[in-house]
């Protein structure tokens, strides 16, 4: 089992999004993921989730794992769900993933566990 965690100030993501708009979103979110954005807190949560997912691999966001190798969606109970690309799943021998995202007091945090 490996674990990754990321925390970010919601205001930081909000500022970047205000400055760069859709160009910023297109750099790290697929069109399907962009539909999940309801407010700055959910946007920051998506950022934290992708960062945490890359850290769980032990590599961070880099040439081995891009933002688009990580897909965030919702399950039938509206809980966040994580899926890695086939390349990542195979190269890192991943059989299970778990993602938790929370927002409080101006911060978004995400924790990812992979087996």
Swiss-Prot record:
GO CC annotation, single: cytoplasm
Residues the record lists as binding Mg(2+): 6, 51
One Pfam family it belongs to: ACPS
Cofactor: Mg(2+)
Gene Ontology biological process terms, A to Z: fatty acid biosynthetic process
GO MF, one annotated term: magnesium ion binding
Localization, UniProt: Cytoplasm
Primary localization: cytoplasm
Main EC class the enzyme belongs to: transferase
Keywords: Cytoplasm, Fatty acid biosynthesis, Fatty acid metabolism, Lipid biosynthesis, Lipid metabolism, Magnesium, Metal-binding, Transferase
Catalytic activity: apo-[ACP] + CoA = holo-[ACP] + adenosine 3',5'-bisphosphate + H(+)
EC number per UniProt: 2.7.8.7
NCBIfam families assigned: acpS, pantethn_trn
Family label: Belongs to the P-Pant transferase superfamily. AcpS family.
Function comment: Transfers the 4'-phosphopantetheine moiety from coenzyme A to a Ser of acyl-carrier-protein.
HAMAP family given in the database record: AcpS
UniProt-recorded name of the protein: Holo-[acyl-carrier-protein] synthase
Organism: Campylobacter jejuni subsp. jejuni serotype O:6 (strain 81116 / NCTC 11828)
Underlying gene: acpS
């Amino acid at each position: 089992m490996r674990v990754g965690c990321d925390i970010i100030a919601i205001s930081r993501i909000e500022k970047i999004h205000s400055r760069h708009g859709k160009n910023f979103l297109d750099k790290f979110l697929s069109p399907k993921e962009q539909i999940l954005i309801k407010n700055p807190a959910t946007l920051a949560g998506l950022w934290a989730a992708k960062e945490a997912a890359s850290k769980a691999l032990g590599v961070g966001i880099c040439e081995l794992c891009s933002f688009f190798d990580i897909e965030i969606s919702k399950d039938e109970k509206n809980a966040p769900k994580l899926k890695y690309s086939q390349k990542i799943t195979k190269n890192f021998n991943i059989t299970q993933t778990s993602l938790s995202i929370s927002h409080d007091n101006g911060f978004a945090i995400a924790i990812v566990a992979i087996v």
